[in-house]
Amino acid sequence: MSYERLLCLVLVASFIAASVAQHPGDAPRMEDDSSAIQRRGLPCGCRGKSGIYWFSGKCPGGYGYTTYCSYVIGLCCVK
């Protein structure tokens, strides 16, 4: 593997890691659970409403999502 490809791979991996990283204090915690389960999503817009972007193939249960919009890799789930 050439050094240029290796450098490109490292840069892409670093960008992805920085994009999905979230400071523990930024994520809201579940109030009824002391094990500190955190929501993992990014803000997005869907049909004129704000939602949460999820990288998974479907909106997770238990958050009260009623609709969603498809994006390139995931979904924007809206309450």
Curated annotation (Swiss-Prot):
A GO MF annotation of the entry reads: ion channel inhibitor activity
Disulfide-linked positions: 44-76, 46-69, 59-77
Gene Ontology CC: extracellular region; nematocyst
- InterPro entries per the UniProt record, alphabetical: BDS_K_chnl_tox, Myo_ane_neurotoxin_sf
Principal location: secreted
Say yes or no: keyword Disulfide bond present.
Answer: yes
Q: Where in the cell is it found?
A: Secreted; Nematocyst
Protein name per its UniProtKB record: U-actitoxin-Bgr3d
| Organism annotation | Bunodosoma granuliferum (Red warty sea anemone)
